[in-house]
């Protein structure tokens, strides 16, 4: 599945569930006894009825059964958390605690848990799947050049921040278009890269983007309140970039949001008489705080319009965005990073 032999430590990592930022391929050698004992406890009351040859289930205590299941789930979760903490402390090699933390972000593992539906693009070929696993755990990607087209030493982290080839722009534009498509379902007057009203006279003291050609990525009406125009600016950051390693992923997203707010918020409020929402994402699938609030609001409005469950809409949104980011990452990994090859 991985395409190579793995170490004992890597096998332990892969055995943890996706919600712990891992892979979810359990090791039956380690979990067989625990799962058997759990099965015995869950079926104990039913087994006793069978032994006593009861003809109906009137003596079957369903409430007690539910309590047993609940306690087993709690115990299992505690066991997995201990395993996760132990593995995180013992990590050596390319996979770091930072990788584990990034992979635990909400929605980061949605590409592993969704149905592989080719009709909506929720599937990878063999090489793409293995490359995705390597990116997820910081492993070396097979058959990639030692040096980047820009002349620097090649690595996954360098590939995802190298401007040559236009892949950073492609990643941004793809996510911008996905968000615009979501908004068209429930918002009005959706525009991509709308021009802002020029600053004149009394507005010359406004901080942030002052140039006449300034434009955020998207604008639309009706998300936060009826008729209100909101501007959005998208940014996808790679949190394992060398300049970010001293900052936690959550702090990094908040910092980048503040930078976006300083650039556009005052102009959106005072000149456009609208509002501004920064949409920050990471290459691992994490969302910034304001992006999370935005998607919750969007999912709520879509679910009410389509009569679907909110959880289903939100899950679809997370999966769609995750695949959008993942595909742009995979293209950058295998693409040519030459200066003359500008895309976008």
Task: List where the protein language model places each region.
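Conserved, well-structured core segments
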Residues: 15-21, 27-30, 218-221, 229-236, ...
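A short acidic (Asp/Glu
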Residues: 30-32, 201-204, 288-292
């Amino acid at each position: 599945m991985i395409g190579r032999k793995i170490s004992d430590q890597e096998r332990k990592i892969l055995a943890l569930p996706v919600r712990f930022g891992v892979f979810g391929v359990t090791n039956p050698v380690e979990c067989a006894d625990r799962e058997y004992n759990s099965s015995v406890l869950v079926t104990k009351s039913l087994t006793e009825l069978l032994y006593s040859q009861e003809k109906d289930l009137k003596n079957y205590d369903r409430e007690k059964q539910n309590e047993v299941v609940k306690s087993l789930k709690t115990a299992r979760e505690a066991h997995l958390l201990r395993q996760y903490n132990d593995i995180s402390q013992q990590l050596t090699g390319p996979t770091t605690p930072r990788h584990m933390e990034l992979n635990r972000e909400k929605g980061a593992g949605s590409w592993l848990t969704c149905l592989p539906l080719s009709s909506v693009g929720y599937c990878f070929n063999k090489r793409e799947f293995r490359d995705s696993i390597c990116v997820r755990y910081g492993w070396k990607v097979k058959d990639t050049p030692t040096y980047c087209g820009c002349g620097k030493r090649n690595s996954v982290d360098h590939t995802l921040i190298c401007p040559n080839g236009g892949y950073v722009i492609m990643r941004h534009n793809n996510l911008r278009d996905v968000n615009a498509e979501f908004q068209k379902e429930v918002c009005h007057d959706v525009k991509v890269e709308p021009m802002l009203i020029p600053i004149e006279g009394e507005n010359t003291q406004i901080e942030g983007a002052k140039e006449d050609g300034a434009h955020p990525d998207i604008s639309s009406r009706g998300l936060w309140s009826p008729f209100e125009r909101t501007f959005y600016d998208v940014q996808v950051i790679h949190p394992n970039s060398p300049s970010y390693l001293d900052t936690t992923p959550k702090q990094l997203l908040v910092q980048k949001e503040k930078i976006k707010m300083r650039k556009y918020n005052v102009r959106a409020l005072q000149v456009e008489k609208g509002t501004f929402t920064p949409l920050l994402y990471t290459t691992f699938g994490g969302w910034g705080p304001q992006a999370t609030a935005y998607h919750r609001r969007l999912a709520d409005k879509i679910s009410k319009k389509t009569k679907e469950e909110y959880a289903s809409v939100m899950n679809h949104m997370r999966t769609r965005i995750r695949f959008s980011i993942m595909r742009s990452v995979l293209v950058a990994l295998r693409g040519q990073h030459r200066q003359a090859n500008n895309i976008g």
